[in-house]
Structures are given as C-alpha cells and as structure tokens.
C-alpha cells in the first residue's frame, strides 16, 4: 500500500511543503526514520530529529516554524498527532477482515450469527447470546449466556464475558480481560464471611477500549457501567456498582473500589486508587499513584496520597526530603527553649 505526500495531505485537509510526489508506504518514529516512511512531530522535545531524519515526509502542526533548514517533505495539518491517528485508522481499516466460524469453536444453536462475524478456534458462545454485524471473537474467547456484543466489536484471545453482560458497538477488548466476574462482596459474621451473590451485570457502551488483563466486576444489583468512549489501559480494576463517565481515560493499574463513580472526560495516571462510595466530578486530572479518600469537584487536578491540589503537592514535595533535618533542628530548638525557660525560672528566684 503506497500513497503520495499530496494524497495524504488531501485526505487530512493539509498542505505539502516540499515534494508532493514523494511516495510513502510505511510509518516510522522520527528518530528512526527510513526511506519511504512517514513520521510525525507533535512534541517540541523531538524537533532536533526533524533536521536529521531519513523519513521522506513528516507530519507537522500548521503553525510549526523550523529553526533550521529541513530536507524532508513536510505535511502541514491543524493537529499532527490527531492527523496521525486518523491516517493510521485508515490504513488499519484496509486490512483484510477475518470472517467465518472455526470448526473447533462452539456456538449455541440459539445464537444467530451475522454473515460477516468471525469466531476463532475454541471460542465459546453460550445460549441466548447476541452478536452484532462485523464483530470478531478471537480464539479462546468465552461469551456467556444472554451476553450482547455490538456491531464491529473485537474481543481478542482469552477475553471472558460473563452471563448477562452487554458490550456496545465498535468496542475493543484486549486479551485476558474479564468482564462481569463477581464483585468482592462478603458479609462478616461470627463464623467468617458469607458470600453476597452478585446478581447484577456489566454494561459497556459504544466505542470503549479495554486493555489486557483488565477486570470489570458485575454489580451486586443493577449494573456496573462503562460509558461511551472510555479508554482503559492494561491491568485496571473496576469493582462492583462503579461507573466511569464518557470519554474518561485510565492508565495502567488504576483501581476503583466498590460504588465509586467517575465523571466525564477525566484523566487518571497509572496506579491511581479510589476508595469506595466516592464521586469524582467531570474533567478531573489525577497524577500517577494519587489516592482518593473523598469526593472531588469537577475540574480539579490532584496529586499525591491522599490526593491534594497539584500546586500544594509540588510545594510539599520540596519540603519532604528536608523533614529529617528539620526534625533534628526542631529537637535542638526545643532543647534550647527548655534550657532558656529553666534559666528564666532560676533568675526569678
């Protein structure tokens, strides 16, 4: 598959600065550019690579002004990173789509399979499940009873979807993810712990992507809900009765305790932890390893554990390394004050 720089610019509503006829057939990082490749520059930290890259063309922002002469062809677009995503989606859509049911797969007779659906080797589709047009179930996927899988959704190898759960259209769920396992619900008693049956389900709305080995637990009752457009990295844990608002993104190892709720357009760094029964507003940003113990207002940016406003945390981080010396100084001052008090007391007599 090959395109000229001009064809790419036309598709992206951009403009060419250089050779519009240069032919491109692959992508490469700007620092590892090769002949015939397209790279991109969206971060100023990588600008110096532009002047030495071997890539034949580079996507840049419309307002980019080079500080040195550029030998490669530039394709100017409003947003280089977004344009790269758009272009790579186009290329990905041109790949041949798998279709048909492998002879080793099991599909219950009650399931109506669309003609263009793919069910891979040793996949298992249970009674009453519903599969949308163009969905793909890779080898060893398990789809439980009454599960609904939307149009164009992809379940990669070893994904497990428990009974009664719903997955929307155009979702991508990566290998090893478990949707709808029992929530961590136990009632303590004199003899130990009694299991609380988890009778709800999980609802995943359209255009959600879920990383490898992520677990989303079914609700005690009602539903655990992942709203439209959410993106979850690998190894994320979402407990029973939680909800994640539309277009929120979680980096790896985020953990939500039960019945916590996150708003729309939030961004959580890696290893963020939420205690149970709290609410996080819309457009909240949490730095890596932030721990939340209480509700958070919309628009907040927090860091640390427990989470505190970013500016306060940055100030505190300057002080933390000095605490041992400060403690010694305080002890010395307390000793001197005590001695002064004793002197004053003796002088009175």
UniProtKB/Swiss-Prot annotation:
UniProt xrefs under InterPro entries: Hexapep, LpxD, Trimer_LpxA-like_sf, UDP_GlcNAc_AcTrfase_non-rep
GO BP annotations listed: lipid A biosynthetic process
Active site feature: 240 (proton acceptor)
Any one of the GO CC terms: membrane
Keywords: Acyltransferase, Lipid A biosynthesis, Lipid biosynthesis, Lipid metabolism, Repeat, Transferase
GO molecular function: N-acyltransferase activity
Pathway entry: Bacterial outer membrane biogenesis; LPS lipid A biosynthesis
Enzyme Commission identifier(s): 2.3.1.191
Chemical reaction(s) catalysed: a UDP-3-O-[(3R)-3-hydroxyacyl]-alpha-D-glucosamine + a (3R)-hydroxyacyl-[ACP] = a UDP-2-N,3-O-bis[(3R)-3-hydroxyacyl]-alpha-D-glucosamine + holo-[ACP] + H(+)
Described function: Catalyzes the N-acylation of UDP-3-O-acylglucosamine using 3-hydroxyacyl-ACP as the acyl donor. Is involved in the biosynthesis of lipid A, a phosphorylated glycolipid that anchors the lipopolysaccharide to the outer membrane of the cell.
Subunit structure: Homotrimer.
UniProt similarity note: Belongs to the transferase hexapeptide repeat family. LpxD subfamily.
NCBIfam families, A to Z: lipid_A_lpxD (TIGR01853), PRK00892.1 (NF002060)
The name this protein goes by in its record: UDP-3-O-acylglucosamine N-acyltransferase
């Amino acid at each position: 598959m090959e395109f000229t720089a001009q064809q790419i610019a036309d598709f992206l509503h951009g403009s060419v600065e250089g050779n519009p006829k240069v032919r491109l057939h692959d992508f490469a990082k700007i620092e590892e550019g090769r002949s015939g490749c397209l790279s991109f520059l969206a971060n100023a930290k990588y600008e110096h690579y532009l002047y030495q890259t071997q890539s034949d063309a580079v996507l840049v922002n419309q307002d980019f002004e080079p500080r040195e002469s550029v030998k490669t062809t530039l394709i100017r677009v409003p947003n280089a990173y977004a344009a790269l995503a758009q272009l790579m989606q186009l290329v990905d859509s041109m790949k041949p789509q798998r279709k048909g049911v492998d002879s080793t797969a099991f599909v219950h007779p009650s399931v109506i399979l669309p003609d263009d659906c793919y069910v891979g080797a040793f996949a298992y589709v249970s009674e009453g499940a519903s599969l949308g047009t163009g969905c793909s179930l890779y080898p060893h996927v398990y789809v439980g009873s009454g599960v609904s899988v939307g149009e164009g959704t992809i379940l990669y190898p070893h994904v497990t979807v428990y009974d009664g759960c719903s997955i929307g259209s155009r979702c991508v769920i990566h290998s090893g993810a478990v949707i709808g396992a029992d929530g961590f619900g136990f009632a303590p008693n004199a003899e130990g712990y009694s299991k609380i049956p988890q009778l709800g389900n999980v609802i995943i709305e359209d255009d959600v992507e879920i990383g490898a080995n992520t677990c989303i637990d079914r609700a005690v009752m009602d539903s655990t809900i992942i709203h439209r457009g959410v993106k979850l990295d690998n190894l994320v844990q979402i407990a029973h009765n939680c909800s994640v608002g539309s277009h929120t993104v979680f980096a790896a190892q985020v953990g939500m305790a039960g019945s916590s709720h996150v708003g729309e357009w939030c961004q959580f760094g890696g290893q963020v932890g939420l205690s149970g029964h709290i609410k996080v507003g819309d457009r909240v940003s949490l730095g890596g390893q932030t721990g939340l113990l209480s509700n958070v207002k919309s628009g907040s940016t927090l860091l640390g554990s427990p989470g505190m406003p970013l500016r306060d945390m940055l100030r505190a981080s300057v002080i933390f390394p000095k605490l041992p010396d400060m403690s010694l100084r305080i002890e010395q001052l307390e000793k001197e004050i005590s001695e002064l008090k004793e002197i004053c007391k003796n002088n009175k007599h």
